[in-house]
């Protein structure tokens, strides 16, 4: 074995030694040796002496494969730092230079802190003998930068085709940070907000799988825009980065925004579902515990304790009605100025029934004890209100007053109390059931007999045709009664006072006569006929009343105060007409009564006496004339006079005709017969008969009066007529959902649509007095206060000032000697009038004048982005697709259009009107065409500026746009 090691250590036996020879490109010393003993019995050392490559037996072994150098080509060997693995040296060592050329220190450099330069690092020569010092033990230098709370964020690498690694997240998870209270957040609000970061491809909200309640967890996934693959990832990154240090606040709730990485969405959902299960289990446990407590209280008599439970005040026991309530101390509420309205808004997420503001405190009443305990647990010492006294937020502490579980005191049973009967056997139950059924059958049979047998028999027996003698006698009595009435009427008319008896002083009653009696005596004496006047006064005192009261006697029935004239006239009318008149006058409003009084003051020509009208007529014609009531008798005249004022149902706005309008339209029996024919009335076919017709008619009159008063109040508030199209056809408006309202109806209920010619003053001017709110107690003789009114400069003065300003600018340009954009002046900006925009009565927004503008004066320039005609057509289509319905494109000439949709001034808000107050002119300023708005007429302050759009006529009627300008000469359409 010693010989083997000697051979191995010898230099000539090295794999790449100097003694190894190369044969055919391969080394000769690469053959493995066989260390096994020789076959001829000699030892290993002797076997190796014969040959280095052959063993004693003469057996030849395979050669070891030569090494193959991978980078042995000429291109690699020409490199400057190439190392030859076969020769074990650098091939270009001779060309290299040593770094120790005397200019650099042999031991290198070290960095040390320079004490004279505030710790700045300095490089100096390294000394190996110098002992090293640990810099951590030294005192750190003072720095002024802020302490880092987070590590420096790496820059975001945009996603492209050369991206290496997993795809970055493009989904955002939005979840609430507070789970104590129920959230009422609508999904479109979340979706629309996060849609501002990028185009949303998918939006989803998640619910609890156990109870289907919303978890308020939302997933927003973005989609890439064409040509930009990094857009969805960048949008998600921007959304998360914006809310990294602050929460997303919406509808009073705070949300966190995170990227959906490593299954974050599923983890969040599982966490929320688990919390809901735990909360539900806790509530069930508390409910079971409460039920057990209630059962113990009901079974065991109450034992008085040291501290009495809180009680409800005596005045609230009936209102509370043994329900759970939460109480807040009155002293606390008075100290901080908290009212019941604050609790209604603060506890809007809970199902309370009533909030009572009592002198002892504020009481919140609940129907369910569980809801009251939930509110107590979630809001006590958590609900915060702002103190109106101390100007600080304060927390509210609630006190729960549970309902008493004591059973009500037993009361003796009365005859009205129903005691359930208990049957011992089944036979008794069957017998009692049969009795009940037989009693019901008896009752039904009695009703059927009365309705089918007794009723028709009695009506047939009472038929007037069966008693001709009684009918004839009754007719004779009626004729005698009519003759008596006619005689009474003639007698009364003969004794009736003339129009001269109604003195103007009689309108004021007896009090005025006593006070001014001397004047009346003098007047009668002057006339020279005291006897006649006294007689007339005596007749008036007996049978007449003042004229102001007699105006009402024509329609109103006053028992015991009507004059004989009214009684005689009323007897000639039918009872049906009297009832109609009564109901008609009862519902007459005060305005109609005042109108009637005003009309009564006018003098009317005195009618001819009855004898003169009857004179010259035959007996038959006289009888026929007297058979008609007084108001229906014909009168001689040039033109026929109507008896009743004309009432056209066609002009009635309401589709449902009220009972008052029906009575106004039906005046006599002829109208009643026509009405029966129109509605195909048949007495025998009437099914639903109203028993108390007077009460039903009174209720209809009451409803009509209330409806009319409501309409008057609405017209006073809205300053416009109310349309029935605004009424909800299915109950309330919430039941109908969202619907598009025509622009014509918006002028009824929108404040800015009510006044077309007098728009609302939407701009507040400092220094202008509000004359409506001035002190009314000031006398007219008070000297006027000194007020400053700004002087109104004319357009001519403005142009002169502008020219002077332009000359100053030209002088500055000449002094500088160079053209500059800073010294360019748009003259139109100096000449424009003070205008503003506000809600318009015509359409959306409008342009208003802040001061009076004279005719032919310039108002404002229509500015915007100058584009070509093809670009304008393309933008118009794009605006329509994006939902921008209003067009702000103004044509200058055939090839140029001004687009003020996104870049422009307030002149774009000018609306169309068929009777415009302004016109547009194209002028040149500095060699460039500009659009300028001029006044066609004098315009008042706060008046809306309008302009005729001059659209071309559309051939398709569906494409025409309705015009809402409200001008007298309105064409109806814009195009």
From Swiss-Prot:
Gene Ontology terms: cellular component: chromosome, telomeric region; Set1C/COMPASS complex
Catalytic activity: L-lysyl(4)-[histone H3] + 3 S-adenosyl-L-methionine = N(6),N(6),N(6)-trimethyl-L-lysyl(4)-[histone H3] + 3 S-adenosyl-L-homocysteine + 3 H(+); N(6)-methyl-L-lysyl(4)-[histone H3] + S-adenosyl-L-methionine = N(6),N(6)-dimethyl-L-lysyl(4)-[histone H3] + S-adenosyl-L-homocysteine + H(+); N(6),N(6)-dimethyl-L-lysyl(4)-[histone H3] + S-adenosyl-L-methionine = N(6),N(6),N(6)-trimethyl-L-lysyl(4)-[histone H3] + S-adenosyl-L-homocysteine + H(+)
E.C. numbers: 2.1.1.354
Naturally occurring in which organism (per UniProt): Eremothecium gossypii (strain ATCC 10895 / CBS 109.51 / FGSC 9923 / NRRL Y-1056) (Yeast)
Biased segments, Acidic residues type: 574-587
Domain notes: The RxxxRR motif forms an adapter helix that bridges the nucleosome and ubiquitin.
Gene: SET1
Protein name, UniProt field: Histone-lysine N-methyltransferase, H3 lysine-4 specific
Sequence motif: RxxxRR motif, positions: 799-804
